UniProtKB/Swiss-Prot annotation:
Cellular compartments annotated: Mitochondrion
Residues engaged in binding [4Fe-4S] cluster 1: 117, 122, 128, 362
Enzyme class (EC, first level): transferase
Transit peptide: 1-32
Keywords for this protein: 4Fe-4S, Iron, Iron-sulfur, Metal-binding, Mitochondrion, S-adenosyl-L-methionine, Transferase, Transit peptide
SUPFAM superfamilies cross-referenced by the UniProt entry: Radical SAM enzymes
Protein name per the record: Lipoyl synthase, mitochondrial
Binding site for [4Fe-4S] cluster 2: 147, 151, 154
Cofactor note: Binds 2 [4Fe-4S] clusters per subunit. One cluster is coordinated with 3 cysteines and an exchangeable S-adenosyl-L-methionine.
Chief localization: mitochondrion
One GO term describing the cellular component: mitochondrion
Length: 398
C-alpha cells in the first residue's frame, strides 16, 4: 500500500509539472533536452516531386488556349537537337544494311568467327562490309574474343585466362575470306599474354592459309607487341602478309594512362621497326586516336618518331567512349583539324595518311593507292604472287 501511494503521488506530481508554469531551472533543463533530441532525430527529407516539377515547368493552360504550347520544346527533344548535348553531326553514321553486309554477317556467324568490327563497335561496319565485292573489307579478330589486357579505351572483353585458341580458326578464316571475294582483308588479334609466343605462329598460319586459297587478296595483320619479344614479330613479318600494322594508339605521355601497363610506347615502336628490318618491302602501319587530351607538340613528336623507323602509313581517328566504364572523351576534334594532321604527315614523308573523325585503324584499308604501292614494291623486288609457297614451314614449328 505504501508503495502504491508513492507511485500515485509521483504520477500526480508529473502531471502537475506538465500543466503548471515551469520554474527557470526546469525550463533550462528541458530546453537542453529538446536541443539534444533535435540533433539525434534524423531530418525529414522532402519528397521527390519530379512529376509535379515537370508538370509545372511545362506549358500552362493559357499556353494551350493561346496556341503557344507547340512552341515549348520537351527537354529531351531539345537535347537531341542541341549539338552540344549530343555527338557532333560529323560523327553520325547511317544504319548498316545491304546484301554484301548481310552476307558477310551470315558467314561470320556460321564459321564462328569474331570480328573487331562488332566487338569494338566500329562505326564504319556498314561502309566496310557493305562495299562492292572488290572494295569490301572485313577485320577478323583471331585468337578468340577475349583479351588478357585491359586498356581504358577498348570495349573488347578481358580475362586473365581466356579460352584456348581454336585450332580450326586459320582454316575457317581462310574459307570465309575466299567466299567473300574480298580484295583486301585485315586480321587483328587480342593480346594473348597467356601464350608462350603471344599467338604469333597462329597468326602466321592463318596468313599462309589465306594466301593458299586466295593469293590475289592483300592481307594486313594488326598484331600486338608480343610483350616485347621481337623474334615473334619476325615470325609474323615472314608469314607472307602485305601490311604489318601495330598501333601506338596515343602519344608517349598519355600511354600509361590510356593503354594497359604492359604496353609501352617504345616497345610498340620497336615492333614496327623490327617488321621493317625483317622485310623492307613490307608496308608498316600504325594508328593514333585523338581527343584524349594530347597536345599538338606531342602529336608532332610522335610522327617524327614514326618516320625515324620508316613507318609508311599512319591513320588518325576520333576516340569515342564505348561505355561509361571507359575513359571519357576530352575533346571532339573537328574535321578541319584532322585535315591539318593529314597534310602535316604527308609533308613529313608518310606514304599514305587516312585522317578523319570516323577513321579507324583498318578503315579504308582497301584504298587503291595502297594496293598499287604494294604491287609495285612486289614487282620491284622480284616477288612472285605465290607468297604462301615461299614461306618456310619451319617458322611455324619454332
Amino acid at each position: 500500500m505504501i508503495a502504491l501511494r508513492v507511485h500515485n503521488t509521483r504520477v500526480v506530481s508529473r502531471s502537475l509539472t506538465v500543466w503548471t508554469r515551469p520554474s527557470p531551472t526546469l525550463t533550462l533543463s528541458r530546453s537542453l533536452a529538446t536541443e539534444s533530441d533535435a540533433l539525434d532525430k534524423p531530418k525529414t527529407r522532402r519528397r521527390k516531386t519530379v512529376f509535379t516539377d515537370a508538370l509545372n515547368s511545362g506549358p500552362s493552360f493559357d499556353d494551350f488556349v493561346s496556341g503557344k504550347a507547340s512552341e515549348i520544346m520537351d527537354p529531351l527533344e531539345a537535347a537531341r537537337k542541341d549539338p552540344n548535348q549530343r555527338l557532333p553531326s560529323w560523327l553520325k553514321v547511317p544504319i548498316p544494311k545491304g546484301k554484301s553486309y548481310h552476307n558477310v554477317k551470315k558467314d561470320v556467324r556460321e564459321l564462328k568467327l569474331a570480328t573487331v568490327c562488332e566487338e569494338a563497335k566500329c562505326p564504319n561496319i556498314g561502309e566496310c562490309w557493305g562495299g562492292k565485292k572488290s572494295e569490301a573489307t572485313a577485320t577478323i579478330m583471331l585468337l578468340g574474343d577475349t583479351c588478357t589486357r585491359g586498356c581504358r579505351f577498348c570495349s573488347v572483353k578481358t580475362n586473365r585466362n581466356p579460352a584456348k585458341p581454336d585450332p580450326m580458326e586459320p582454316e575457317n578464316t581462310a574459307e570465309a575470306i575466299s567466299r567473300w571475294g574480298l580484295g583486301y582483308v585485315v586480321l587483328t588479334t587480342v593480346d594473348r599474354d597467356d601464350l608462350a609466343d603471344g599467338g604469333a605462329h597462329h597468326l602466321a598460319e592463318t596468313v599462309m592459309k589465306i594466301k593458299q586459297k586466295a593469293p590475289q587478296i592483300l592481307v594486313e595483320v594488326l598484331g600486338g607487341d608480343f610483350r616485347g619479344d621481337l623474334d615473334m614479330a619476325t615470325v609474323l613479318a615472314k608469314s607472307g602478309l602485305d601490311v604489318y600494322a601495330h598501333n601506338l594508339e596515343t602519344v608517349e605521355a598519355l600511354t600509361p594512362f590510356v593503354r594497359d601497363r604492359r604496353a609501352t610506347y617504345r616497345q610498340s615502336l620497336s615492333v614496327l621497326q623490327r617488321a621493317k628490318e625483317t622485310k623492307s618491302s613490307l608496308v608498316t602501319k600504325t594508328s593514333l586516336m585523338l581527343g584524349l587530351g594530347e597536345t599538338d607538340e606531342q602529336i608532332l613528336q610522335t610522327l617524327k618518331d614514326l618516320r625515324e623507323i620508316n613507318c609508311d602509313v599512319v591513320t588518325f581517328g576520333q576516340y569515342m567512349r564505348p561505355t561509361k566504364r571507359h575513359m571519357k572523351v576530352v575533346e571532339y576534334v573537328t574535321p578541319e583539324k584532322f585535315d591539318y594532321w593529314r597534310d602535316t604527315a604527308l609533308e613529313m614523308g608518310f606514304l599514305y595518311v587516312a585522317s578523319g573523325p570516323l577513321v579507324r585503324s583498318s578503315y579504308k584499308a582497301g584504298e587503291a593507292f595502297i594496293e598499287n604501292v604494294i604491287r609495285k614494291r612486289r614487282h620491284n623486288v622480284g616477288e612472285a604472287p605465290r607468297l604462301a609457297q615461299e614461306i618456310q614451314p619451319k617458322i611455324f614449328r619454332e
